Amino acid sequence: MDDENATLLTEFVLTGLTYQSEWKIPLFLAFLVIYLITIMANLGLIAVIWKDSHLHIPMYLFLGSLAFVDAWLSSSVTPKMLISFLAKSMIISVSECKIQFFSFGISGTTECFLLATMAYDRYVAICKPLLYPVIMTNGLCIWLLVLSFIGGFLHALIHEGILFRLTFCNSNIIHHFYCDIIPLLKISCTDPSINFLMLFILSGSIQVFTILTVLVSYTFVLFTILKKKAKDIRKAFSTCGAHLLSVSLYYGPLLFMYVHPASPQADDQDMVESLFYTVIIPFLNPIIYSLRNKQVIDSLTKTLKGNV
């Protein structure tokens, strides 16, 4: 009987960020402003890089790709979340849930690979400056980007395939503001052990690989910087500082989610942490990279003056 009911399940109910009605309109307005700025800032950064031929180098190719993924990541989650603030109950169909989960999975994993790729690019630029044009060719850069997106696609596809083979009959209420894997596994009436195992193996491997790539790259960068003159040190730190800040902000909440114990309070913490890297990080990244990058600021200023 449970399997029959599970087969007939056509929708989930998202609990959203808050039950308190007095907070819904203020939160809607706040996140609407954040989302609009996120989209405009990331697309604006892409436009600046596209328009200025001086920025057609690997570093900015990766930065433009990161801006695209940030806009995609935010758009996978935020529009539905905004609707939830205005609706009495947040119902999402199983088909919509699958699409949201898949879209979020691709963009989130691709961002991890892009951050690692950008760290490697900085390593080559600072540690092997004379060989940089030889190593970071257009072909290699495009290949690294393609691999990042393929990795994100395959990772999301595998989890999507094994997740929605489960049956959901315990409840159709997802304690989250979007269709995330852990809240979905919690309401499954089928044994999700294989899902947790694959989550540990695949997601864990990706996290370890990308974090190690960043750490090893910047360890070599740090040792190289310390041998340089004060002027060169400042220039190197200005180049790497934005990326290091972005990596710290992205991986901090992500790693914390895996180490704190499971509890009802932890579920609420997970929502706050998810909110940080799905909404806040895509909002902050273009600001961080623009304000700390003189070439981007100069190009943006030139573009704005040209349009006046």
From Swiss-Prot:
Pfam families: 7tm_4 (PF13853). Keywords: Cell membrane, Disulfide bond, G-protein coupled receptor, Membrane, Olfaction, Receptor, Sensory transduction, Transducer, Transmembrane, Transmembrane helix. SUPFAM superfamilies: Family A G protein-coupled receptor-like. GO terms for molecular function: G protein-coupled receptor activity; odorant binding; olfactory receptor activity. Gene3D superfamilies: Rhodopsin 7-helix transmembrane proteins. Disulfide bonds join C97-C179. It is a multi-pass membrane protein. This is Olfactory receptor 5H8. It comes from Homo sapiens. The gene is OR5H8.
